[in-house]
Amino acid sequence: MILDILVKLNKLKIILASTSPRRIEYLGKLGVKFEIVESKFKEDLDKSQFQSVYDYCLENAKLKAIHAGIQLKEQNQQPNIIIGSDSIVVYDNKIFEKPKSLEEAKSMLTLLSGKIHTVCTAVHIEFFNENTNSKGSSSFYTLTNVEFDQLSPELINYYVDNFKPLDKAGSYGIQQTPAASFIKSINGDFYNVTGLPIHDLSINLRKIYVDNFLEK
């Protein structure tokens, strides 16, 4: 969705406010040239203050982008586009983020075993055009339903003990072949499950560029 404007888009200073290997990989494979800034946002929001789990995810993505912008401003840098993203796993209206321990990871996978859960990835984009002095933002989230097969306690224990998925929302990474073998079906954007909804991101980047940077 952005291939025809990629050359022009890549003339902008674009920041990815994430050090996630998968987000870095897939944004790069899309052909976008960008720099990486690790946002210092602590991700310590009170979930009970949000009307929905998706609002919580959106706010995390927003604050990641905003904090990255503040960090760059302190270094006298002004990018054109900052992309913040956050992913959560949702089951029974409960949020499964990155587990804090191996035991918590095992508990998460036990709850998800044999069931359909939802992966929500929220994206927040801050933009600034220095030529027109215009700025703004855009936010969205993408949902993908993932169905797990039945996972035995032995399988869960082996996976967690050997692959230690403490950096994965929901305690699994679909890009890891062992974890991919848990998945019976996927309904929605595969890349969304990895942490970056490529299709929806492309649509939003295109709209931001055409509306705010394309010379009329």
From Swiss-Prot:
Top-level taxonomic group: Eukaryota
Pfam families the record matches: Maf
Enzyme class: hydrolase
List of catalytic residues: D86
Subcellular location field: Cytoplasm
EC number(s) per entry: 3.6.1.9
Cofactor: a divalent metal cation
CDD domains: Maf (cd00555)
Cellular component annotations (GO), alphabetically ordered: cytoplasm
Catalyses which reaction(s): a ribonucleoside 5'-triphosphate + H2O = a ribonucleoside 5'-phosphate + diphosphate + H(+); a 2'-deoxyribonucleoside 5'-triphosphate + H2O = a 2'-deoxyribonucleoside 5'-phosphate + diphosphate + H(+)
Keywords: Cytoplasm, Hydrolase
Gene Ontology molecular functions: nucleoside triphosphate diphosphatase activity
Family (UniProt): Belongs to the Maf family.
Protein's job: Nucleoside triphosphate pyrophosphatase. May have a dual role in cell division arrest and in preventing the incorporation of modified nucleotides into cellular nucleic acids.
Alphabetical list of PANTHER family matching this protein: BIFUNCTIONAL DTTP/UTP PYROPHOSPHATASE/METHYLTRANSFERASE PROTEIN-RELATED (PTHR43213), BIFUNCTIONAL DTTP_UTP PYROPHOSPHATASE_METHYLTRANSFERASE PROTEIN-RELATED (PTHR43213:SF5)
Name of the featured protein: Nucleoside triphosphate pyrophosphatase
Organism for this UniProt entry: Dictyostelium discoideum
